[in-house]
């Protein structure tokens, strides 16, 4: 039987079920078999792996994963696609499809129920553009024993995730992701590979989980506030952005001056010039200032 992703078979499946794409769900189905196989290769998927897939669509990528993996657990939010998936994937007995929103799913419980715990846990997904960041951060911060993730997303977002300090793309998202994972932008997927065709190209990003966060800080909440505030207005200096974030009262200014001096960071520095380690150091210096005591926790 032809691969699900074969353009002609994809058209037949969509026609048979009278499927209409929902823009609100960011539905774009990949119909390039070569790229699908490259995604599976990027995940280094073998029979030693259990795989969570997000957004299987009509099963094009699911099929390729199922041929390599031990078990596959797919989350599909669109209930119209459930009967389609039961049809297209009925030959793959190692696939379970759940009609659930990944952001609302109790992942530890579901993993324990559907996987035996004896295999590596990997995640592969073609993420809808409109909800890429929430899903990605949800997975990274869930505390799951993820060995490897391979996510397809908008090229611009991928470049921000993979960005280094000093680059225009470097920002709070770069830091949030790189704290938890080593990141690599693997390859670009042209918009012509999808049905319907999106407006922009996509990219495949590989994530390898860190055993420990890249940095540890005394106060994670304060660190998050610091990073968020520092990048709030990219053209402004760290000094201006941090006053806007924490306040312009004299005691706050004094605390900021002391912390910046202790961390050996000039107030005129811009956020994109700081490494993650420097942000961690500055966060700990702020945490030692009495004026920031109320922000601890």
Curated annotation (Swiss-Prot):
Belongs to the class I-like SAM-binding methyltransferase superfamily. rRNA adenine N(6)-methyltransferase family. RsmA subfamily. GO terms for molecular function: 16S rRNA (adenine(1518)-N(6)/adenine(1519)-N(6))-dimethyltransferase activity; RNA binding. The lineage of its organism: Bacteria, Bacillati, Bacillota, Bacilli, Lactobacillales. PROSITE patterns: RRNA_A_DIMETH (PS01131), SAM_RNA_A_N6_MT (PS51689). It is found in: Cytoplasm. Keywords: Cytoplasm, Methyltransferase, RNA-binding, rRNA processing, S-adenosyl-L-methionine, Transferase. It is an enzyme of class 2 (transferase). Gene3D superfamilies: Ribosomal RNA adenine dimethylase-like, domain 2 (1.10.8.100), Vaccinia Virus protein VP39 (3.40.50.150). This is Ribosomal RNA small subunit methyltransferase A. It holds the Pfam family RrnaAD. Specifically dimethylates two adjacent adenosines (A1518 and A1519) in the loop of a conserved hairpin near the 3'-end of 16S rRNA in the 30S particle. May play a critical role in biogenesis of 30S subunits. S-adenosyl-L-methionine binds at residues 28, 30, 55, 76, 101, 126. It catalyses: adenosine(1518)/adenosine(1519) in 16S rRNA + 4 S-adenosyl-L-methionine = N(6)-dimethyladenosine(1518)/N(6)-dimethyladenosine(1519) in 16S rRNA + 4 S-adenosyl-L-homocysteine + 4 H(+). NCBIfam families: ksgA (TIGR00755). GO terms for cellular component: cytosol. InterPro entries: KsgA/Erm, rRNA_Ade_diMease-like_C, rRNA_Ade_Mease_Trfase_CS, rRNA_Ade_methylase_Trfase_N, rRNA_adenine_dimethylase, SAM-dependent_MTases_sf. Its EC number is 2.1.1.182. The keyword Cytoplasm applies. It comes from Latilactobacillus sakei subsp. sakei (strain 23K) (Lactobacillus sakei subsp. sakei). The keyword ATP-binding does not apply.
């Amino acid at each position: 039987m032809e691969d699900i992703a074969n353009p002609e078979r994809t058209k037949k499946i969509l026609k048979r079920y009278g499927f209409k794409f929902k823009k609100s769900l960011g539905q774009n189905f990949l119909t390039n078999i070569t790229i699908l196989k490259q995604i599976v290769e990027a995940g280094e998927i073998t029979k030693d792996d259990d795989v969570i897939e997000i957004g299987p669509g009509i099963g094009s990528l699911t099929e390729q994963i199922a041929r390599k993996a031990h078990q596959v657990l797919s989350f599909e939010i669109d209930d119209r696609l459930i009967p389609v998936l039961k049809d297209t994937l009925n030959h793959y007995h190692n696939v379970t499809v759940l009609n659930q929103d990944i952001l609302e799913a109790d992942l530890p419980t579901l993993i324990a129920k559907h996987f035996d715990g004896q295999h590596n846990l990997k995640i592969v997904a073609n993420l809808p553009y409109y909800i890429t960041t929430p899903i990605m951060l949800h997975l990274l911060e869930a505390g799951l024993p993820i060995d490897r993730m391979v996510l397809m997303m908008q090229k611009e977002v991928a470049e921000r995730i993979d960005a280094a300090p000093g680059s225009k793309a470097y920002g709070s998202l770069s830091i949030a992701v790189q704290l938890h994972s080593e990141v690599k932008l693997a390859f670009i997927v042209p918009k012509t590979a999808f049905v319907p065709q999106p407006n922009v190209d996509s990219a495949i990003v590989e994530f390898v989980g860190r055993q420990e966060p890249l940095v540890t800080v005394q106060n994670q909440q304060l660190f998050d506030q610091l990073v968020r505030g520092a990048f709030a207005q990219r053209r402004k200096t760290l000094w201006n952005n941090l006053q806007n974030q924490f306040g312009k009262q004299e005691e706050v200014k004094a605390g900021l001056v002391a912390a910046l001096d202790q961390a050996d960071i000039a107030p005129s520095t811009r956020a994109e010039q700081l490494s993650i380690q420097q942000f961690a150091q500055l966060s700990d210096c702020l945490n030692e200032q009495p004026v920031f005591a109320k922000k601890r926790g």
